[in-house]
């Protein structure tokens, strides 16, 4: 072999190693544990409002295959099937709302334009029941999941929504539709990494 061929082979090998390392580091960074803090606020029809701190500690994110499996479960059997699938899986972190802590069973991150991200967090049990005019509102059949949607900004605080007790189904356009136990929307503001 000529010296120039050996140099080309060496360069190609080093380039391959560098590309592999970049891919591995990106994968590790995407799976790194993440803690987010926010303020959850709700206002009822009479104008009374309540705000409490929220902490979402995410220890692992779902793969595309796990996402597809969850969507298939919702299509097949709605909330009950989704809950069964989620209960079998390992915890992906926790949501702490005030003094109540609930296991996250599914955490999925999607990159948006400009470096923003959309996170979907799902619990296999309600985070709490908001409504019925009482702080300790009672459960209603079928509202068995908790959902958190977070829009994280590349710079500055993000925002989101918390559906503390929900039913889920798939509509005719294959979109996930949620039905909230309560009439009031829980807004998440000032969402930042801790």
Map each language-model feature to its residues.
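N-terminal secretory signal peptides that target proteins for export/translocation
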Residues: 1-11
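Intrinsically disordered, low-complexity segments
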Residues: 2, 24-25
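A residue-level detector for conformationally permissive "hinge/kink" positions
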Residues: 8, 22, 69-70
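Bacterial N-terminal signal peptides
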Residues: 12-24
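Sec/Tat signal peptide C-region and signal peptidase I cleavage site
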Residues: 26-30
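Long, low-hydrophobicity ectodomains and other hydrophilic envelope-associated domains
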Residues: 32-76, 80-194
